[in-house]
Amino acid sequence: MLNVSVTTSSGAIEGLGKFLQYGNGRGVPSYAAFTREHTHRVHDPKYVDWDTVVSLGNTDAFVKALMLFYTSGDTLLVDEWTYPAIIGTVVPMNIQLAPVRMDAEGMVPEALDHVCTNWTGERKLRMVYTIPTAQNPTGATMSIARKRAIYAVAQKHNLVIIEDDPYYYLQFEPYTADSENRYTNLPGITSLVPSLLSLDTDGRVIRLDSFSKVLAPGLRCGWVTAPKYITDKIQFHNETSIQQPAGVSQAIVASLMNEQWGHSGWERHLVQIQRDYAMRRDLFVDLCLKHLNGLVEFTVPDAGMFLWFRVLLKPELQGQTGVMQRVFDSMVANHVLL
């Protein structure tokens, strides 16, 4: 049972009454303190004036970060295949999208540089949005070398990077057909691929984190890490909109992280989550290799929950109209979720 009725002290959280009151836009102190300490432990930002601020999850955080820099008519750089909710968010704001080519590791740095170098729009490109780990929908994960290259292009063209990383802790080992040697080297926290935030020396990365994929999406609890002048503005935006995540949700997270688990217990929980998702990945890939061989191509993901199929059409079907509609109709008839 969670204890949310203690008074504030070292390693403890506020009393329940504190969580049930209105609060400021930075979050209840024990919740906010954990997210900041956790960010320092995992990402160790390389510049001094960084901070964290609460969010209702990464979509909420994305909107607030975007509104700090963008107005109607601006253009946002995104992955060639990007998170559908982002499209639904920016279109009503009359913000255009400039897609950047992807490969098996996500956004291609040379393609990003090409788009920026040859940009002819009236307004300057200022921001690039990417999901570097287990990208939604393709499942692509950037290596550390790819992240360094993307960051270098951002420096060259003076771009702000929105690092939307809800699947960051869902990294696991490469797939092996040898079921006896699976799940022996899960990364936990210490062996994760370093984040873009951890590479940032200029204060140009706005990192979005969430508990949605590792605790529960209904908690609506997340946080933003960025230079303090940005987190301060997001705090002010919170105070005129959401105020902060629901007090009960913050109480649950704060109690787990500060009293029940601590950082070591949190890492043990993440290892178990990584194991669970690795098992699901392996079972799904095993079945795909068994039943879909020759019908589709795919890259086996090393993180997250997405596997991106490329349907292999027979030569005589290529170029015909209506083929994908027939594929879709066949999936519906066979009760396959697309």
Where are these regions (language model features)?
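Conserved core segment of the aminotransferase class I/II
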Residues: 194-275
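Residue-level recognition of strand-loop junctions within catalytic nucleotide-signaling folds
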Residues: 171, 227-228, 258, 310-312
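Conserved glycine-rich beta-strand-loop-beta hairpin in the small C-terminal domain of fold type I
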Residues: 270-274, 278-285, 296-314
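A structural signal for well-ordered alpha-helical segments within the folded catalytic domains
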Residues: 29-33, 148, 228, 247-251, ...
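Alpha-helical scaffold elements within enzyme catalytic domains, especially in hydrolases
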Residues: 89, 152-153, 233, 276, ...
